[in-house]
A protein has these predicted regions:
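Conserved acidic donor-binding segment of nucleotide-sugar-dependent glycosyltransferases
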Residues: 108-109, 113-119, 128-133
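A conserved mid-protein helix/loop that constitutes part of the nucleotide-sugar donor-binding site
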Residues: 1-17, 23, 34-40, 82
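Short acidic/histidine- and often glycine-rich active-site loop of Leloir-type glycosyltransferases
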Residues: 86, 99-109, 113-114
Length: 162
């Protein structure tokens, strides 16, 4: 959703920092919402039309996760995030803002990176994973394994309910 909670305004500023630091990256935002026009305007003002892409609502987000080296979940507040769980399932290295819901799903430095919700912290976390492929691989693998644990927990709960 393109709304205030998701902090895409801050994400756009983080992408500008990444580009200005000389990195080539693409950031896809899926979905629709009330902030689309203001976000598109900001992207254009910062010259990020080729780097920050908003294809709109898609019926299947998994191809986007699958091609992503890094999944970024920078939100102002969050409950349990299905998007984080989907990214873990597909083994994405995750960068997420350090808020309650995200903190419950990610162990910083192990299966993802938690950062402050500001452009510098987000950009620095992303750049650290771009620069350190081994760190990115380890985080990605830990995220994938965490999903296996989730599946085991769900199976156990279903068995207990029968």
């Amino acid at each position: 959703r393109l709304n205030y909670q998701k902090a895409y305004d801050i994400a756009i500023d983080a992408m500008k920092r990444i580009k200005d630091a000389g990195y080539k990256a693409r950031w896809y935002i899926l979905g629709e919402g009330s902030e689309r026009n203001s976000l598109e305007k900001k992207v254009k003002e910062l010259g990020l039309e080729k780097e920050f892409l908003m294809p709109g609502a898609v019926s299947n987000p998994f191809p986007y996760y699958k091609q992503a080296d890094i999944y970024v979940h920078a939100t102002r507040f969050e409950g349990k995030s299905i998007a984080i769980q989907e990214a873990q399932t597909l083994g994405c290295a995750i960068v997420a803002s350090d808020c309650n819901g995200n903190r419950e799903q990610i162990i910083h430095g192990e299966d993802g990176l938690l950062c402050k919700l500001d452009p510098k912290s987000i950009a620095d976390s992303i750049i650290s994973l771009i620069d350190d492929k081994e760190k990115r691989r380890k985080i990605s693998e830990a995220a994938r394994k965490k999903d296996i644990v989730h599946k085991g927990e769900i199976k156990l709960l279903l068995e207990l309910m029968q």
